[in-house]
Amino acid sequence: MKSAWALALACTLLLAASVTAEEVDVDATVEEDLGKSREGSRTDDEVVQREEEAIQLDGLNASQIKEIREKSEKFAFQAEVNRMMKLIINSLYKNKEIFLRELISNASDALDKIRLISLTDENALAGNEELTVKIKCDKEKNMLHVTDTGIGMTKEELIKNLGTIAKSGTSEFLNKMTEMQDDSQSTSELIGQFGVGFYSAFLVADRVIVTSKHNNDTQHIWESDSNEFSVIDDPRGNTLGRGTTITLVLKEEASDYLELDTVKNLVKKYSQFINFPIYVWSSKTETVEEPVEEEEAKEEKEETDDNEAAVEEEEEEKKPKTKKVEKTVWDWELMNDIKPIWQRPSKEVEEDEYKAFYKTFSKEHDDPMAYIHFTAEGEVTFKSILFVPNSAPRGLFDEYGSKKSDFIKLYVRRVFITDDFHDMMPKYLNFVKGVVDSDDLPLNVSRETLQQHKLLKVIRKKLVRKTLDMIKKIAEEKYNDTFWKEFGTNVKLGVIEDHSNRTRLAKLLRFQSSHHESNLTSLDQYVERMKEKQDKIYFMAGASRKEAESSPFVERLLKKGYEVIYLTEPVDEYCIQALPEFDGKRFQNVAKEGVKFEESEKSKESREALEKEFEPLLNWMKDKALKDKIEKAVLSQRLTQSPCALVASQYGWSGNMERIMKAQAYQTGKDISTNYYASQKKTFEINPRHPLIKDMLRRVKENEDDKTVSDLAVVLFETATLRSGYMLPDTKEYGDRIERMLRLSLNIDLDAKVEEEPEEPEDAAEEAEQDEEEVDADAEDSETQKESTDVKDEL
C-alpha cells in the first residue's frame, strides 16, 4: 500500500517538474557581465555607469585616431622644451618609475585649482563634482591612462603649458588667483610647475595623448611623440565633464607598468598621502550566487534517497535553486586610504593613530619608543612627525656617515619627493624615522638636486631641535633601560660632531659611576652629588668597569668619597674630550696630570717634607734609571695602595686611548708610533708610603749604581705601564727582567745556565728503538698464545 502511494507521489512530482521546465527558456544563460558587479544585488544602471566610466578611460578607436592625425593642427616644440626632454630622457631621471609620481602630482595640482575656484564659484564643479585621480591599465592596447577631475586645460593652455617651458600652467594660475585671494588664505598649495614634470612621461612612452576639458572651452586632444605635437577638438565631444586624461602608449621595455601590482606599489610608494583619493581599476575574485541549471537539478534529484525525496522537493520549491560561483570582478580600488595625519592638529590625533601610522609608514611591527608631531613656522613652514624606533635598525653603524639615511621621507604638498638624503638629518640621528611635508619647497624636475636647497638647512636645524626635545621627554626609567641601550652611542657621537647642540646633547649622556654598581647616572645627577669644594668632574676610562674601578688612578679619589665616572666604551673618551665643561665644571681624566686635592696647612707641610726626603730617588729615576723612558718622576697624591703609576700629560694619550688608537691603526694599516701624542713621555708617580718605594730610597742612598736597584726601578716602571693601561713595546725584555728578579729573590746565581738534555748517539738511539719494537712483538705473541690457551680450556 505504502509503495503504491509513494509511486503515485513521485509521478505527480515529475509531471509538475516537466511543466515548470516548459515555462523556462532552456537556452537562457547567466548574464555575461554579472561578474562585473561587486555585489549580485547591484542595479543595471550602476553596472552601466561603472562600465562607461571605464570606457571613458580607454584610448581612442582607430577611426578617431586617424581623424585626429589628419585634421589636427601641428606644432613644433619650443627649443628649450626639446633640450629639456632630451635631458630628462637621457640623464636627469635615473629612475623611470617617477613618471607616475609626476603625473599624479600634476593631477593633484589641477584638483587643488578647481577646489579653490569652487569656494567662490558654485558652478565650478557642475561638469563633474568628483575630485579624484583614476588610473587604468589597458594591456591589450599597451596603454596606461591617468585621469583627474581637476581644472582641465583649454586649447590655448594645452599649447602653452605643454609646448613651452617658460610658462608654467600652475604658476600662471597662481598669478591670476592672487587678486582673488583673501589675505588670510594661503596660496602655497598652488605652487608648482606642471609643464616640466609632465615630460617625464616620455621616459616610458613612445607617444603621449592628453585629453582635457576646461569649463571655459570644449574638450581637446593633445598628442606628441616627443618630436612635435598636435592639438584638435575631440571628435567624441565632452566625455570627461571636466578634467584631464593622460594616455601613455608605452615603450616595449616599459610594459611592466601595465601590471596592476606594479602600478599599485608605485602609487603607495610615492602618492599615498596626496590630498585627493587615487583609484586604480582593479580586479578581484568574488563568490556570487547563480541559478542552478535544469540538468544539474535533475542529477541532484536522481541521487536523492526515495524515502527523503518528498521532503527535499518540498523545501526546494520554497527557495530558488542557486549555486556559488567564483567570478572576476572589476572596480575602482582606493589606494591612498591612509590619511596624512601630520596635516591634522596634534590634539586631534589619538595615540593609537600615531602607532598605526608608524607601523604602516616604517613597516615595523613594534610600537615606536617616542614620537613628536609639530608644525614649524618662520623662514620655512613645514609639518612633521618624527619617531624613535623601539630598537636600533640593523647595521646602524655599518659604513657610518657614508650611506644615505632612508628613514626621513620628504613630501612637498603631500607628494613624496625622496628619502635619498645625505644630510636631511645629521649622521648621529640616523635612527630617527619620520615624514617632513613642506609647502615652501619647489615641486619640479629639479628635485633631484633639492638637497642643495637653502631651505633644507633650515628644516634640518629645526628637525634636530625637535628630535632632541622628543628624546629629552622620554621617561627616565625607559630612557636608561631602553633608549640608552639602543642609541647611547649615537648621542655620544652627537656630542663629538654637533657643536651647536653639544650642550643639549650633554644632558642626554648616561654613564656608569662609582655611585652605584649598576644604575646609570647623568651629568646633572653627578653635579648634584659633587662635594662642596669639588670643581671638576672626575672620570676614568677602561676596557671594562672592573678595569676602571681597579685602576691605581682612582684609589685616593674613592677613599676620599669622590664619585668617579667610568668610561667603558671606545667612543666615551672621545666624547668627553669634545665636551670642555658641563654646568661650569671642567672634566678631569684621573689618568692624566692635574688631579689635586684640598689640603690643610699641616698636610701641605707633610707633603713638602716627603718631597725633600725622596728627592734623591726622584732625581735618580729621572736622570739615570729611567732616563729615556719618563718626562719626570714625582710623588703621587692619587695613590694609596699601588707603589707607582704612569701618568699622561694633559694633552697626551691615556692608556685606554692609546689602546684604541693602535687598534684603529692596525685596521687601517697606519703606523702611529711616530704620532706626537703617542711619542710623548709620561710622568712617573711613586707612592712614598709604599714599602717597595721606601726600600728603593734606602738602596739608592747606599749605592745608586746597584744593578739590582736599577732592574727594580725598570720593573716597577714596566709594571706601572701595564697597570696604567699602556702596552709594553718589548715584552721579551720585560720577561727577562722579571726572571732576573725571581732568581735574586730565590738566591739563584744570575749566570746559572739551563741544564741541557743529554743527546744519545744516533746508533744507540736506533738500537734502543729496535729493542723496544722487539719487546713489543714478544709481548704481543705472548698475549696471543695466552688467549689461544684460554679458548682451548673453555672448549
Swiss-Prot record:
The record marks 447 as: Important for ATP hydrolysis. Keywords: ATP-binding, Calcium, Chaperone, Disulfide bond, Endoplasmic reticulum, Glycoprotein, Hydrolase, Nucleotide-binding, Sarcoplasmic reticulum, Signal, Stress response. One of its GO terms (molecular function) is ATP binding. Residues 289-316, 756-782 have a biased composition (Acidic residues). A motif (Prevents secretion from ER) lies at residues 792-795. Residues 783-795 have a biased composition (Basic and acidic residues). It is found in: Endoplasmic reticulum lumen; Sarcoplasmic reticulum lumen. GO terms for biological process: ERAD pathway; intracellular iron ion homeostasis; protein folding. ATP binds at residues 106, 148, 161, 198. GO terms for cellular component: endoplasmic reticulum; perinuclear region of cytoplasm; sarcoplasmic reticulum lumen. It is an enzyme of class 3 (hydrolase). Glycans are attached at residues 61, 106, 216, 444, 480, 501. Its EC number is 3.6.4.-. Pfam families: HATPase_c_3, HSP90. Homodimer; disulfide-linked. Belongs to the heat shock protein 90 family. PANTHER family: HEAT SHOCK PROTEIN 90 FAMILY MEMBER (PTHR11528). This is Endoplasmin. It comes from Gallus gallus. The gene is HSP90B1.
